């Protein structure tokens, strides 16, 4: 389903929206990077300057990498890096926005429909980057192949405040949801244990193909 609050939940976790009730507790060491569906970049800004506003270097699985080298990795050749952002296509702007989020070196990465408007090459680069990413990934996506590629756990919101946890990716979720009592209800557990974004572990996916899926994290002791 669409319009059931998946993106709103991501924005609440990221701190862009206040919840109607309750509190969101973020650990002191948590640094959230948010990749949303809207891209708003000053058109006069140079490509490389936009990325350097986040950081000039970022530590990856390959070591410390410069902004220019990361731009090349994300398909922006040196001659394009000094062009104004306004000359980029919509897909290129979204790719640049994604890179800037990654350059900020978050340890919790929120991806809201990350595969929208990304070409196949960029998607492959993102998936490879996530393979070596040491932090937490929380994503909303209708792309079942992407979910199977990166997700280790899915939380399904099944109405009336019921949240069911399924281990595995999208295919595992579809198979297990056909089995009686195959999922673990976590909504009551989350409220009783003080769940927060800081307790998240592993890559978590949210998908709205058949039911509204959203993220909630168990406490670290679970």
Q: What would you call each of these model-derived segments?
A:
Residues 1-213, 217:
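ABC ATP-binding cassette signature C-motif
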Residues 218-222:
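A short, hydrophobic C-terminal helix/tail in secreted or cell-surface proteins
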């Amino acid at each position: 389903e669409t319009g059931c609050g998946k993106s709103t939940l991501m924005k609440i976790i990221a701190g862009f929206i206040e919840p109607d009730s309750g509190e969101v507790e973020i650990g002191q060491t948590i640094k959230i990077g948010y990749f949303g569906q809207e891209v708003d970049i000053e058109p006069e800004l140079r490509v490389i300057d936009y990325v350097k506003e986040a950081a000039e270097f970022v530590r990856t699985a390959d070591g410390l990498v410069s902004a220019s080298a990361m731009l090349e990795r994300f398909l922006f050749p040196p001659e394009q890096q000094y062009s104004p952002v306004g000359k980029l296509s919509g897909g290129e702007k979204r790719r640049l926005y994604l890179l800037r989020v990654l350059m900020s070196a978050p340890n919790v990465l929120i991806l809201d429909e990350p595969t929208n408007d990304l070409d196949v090459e960029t998607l492959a680069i993102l998936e490879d980057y996530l393979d070596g990413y040491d932090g937490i990934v929380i994503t909303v996506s209708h792309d079942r192949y992407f979910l199977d590629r990166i997700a280790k756990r899915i939380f399904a919101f099944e109405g009336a405040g019921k949240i069911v946890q399924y281990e595995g990716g999208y295919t595992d979720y579809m198979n297990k949801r056909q089995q009686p009592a195959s999922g673990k209800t976590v909504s009551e557990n989350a409220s009783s244990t003080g769940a927060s974004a800081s307790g998240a572990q592993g890559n978590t996916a949210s998908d709205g193909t058949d039911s509204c899926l959203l993220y909630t994290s168990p406490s670290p002791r679970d």
